[in-house]
Amino acid sequence: MAIKTAFAPVLTVPNGITDIDFYKNAFGATTNFCLTNDDGSIHVAELLIDGALFHVHEETQQSTMVSPAKYGASTVTIGLFVDDVQAMFNRAAAAGATVMTPVTDYEYGYRQGDLKDPFGHKWTIQCRIPVSSDWKP
């Protein structure tokens, strides 16, 4: 059986049980499944945003993965393509995300805005729009 290639980011958060609620409130994420460790921490939660899959792990003493908030920086940006950028952007901000760059239309054919979630992960909420006739790559 052929498998369609997909990209599934893995995000690490300080407190999985409560932090997953941010993704539900901000982006309408749903939980596909959630596995816990013996101490009650989250080993992995598989979440979906309108069918787009991602995983959340909780920081633990045994893990080498940490939330970007621990160092005040992130090495990646999660690009989330949606139909209504402004509505999703506003929803995420209302749920506790920090606005980094407001939603802007760019001449190269993107409407996008940048947010930082409460755990330090950077999100670009975006969609394609017509390229400006003045734009030259």
Regions inferred by a protein language model and the residue ranges of each:
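C-terminal catalytic core of tyrosine-transesterase DNA break-rejoin enzymes
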Residues: F119
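Vicinal oxygen chelate
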Residues: M1-L11, I20-K116, Q126-P137
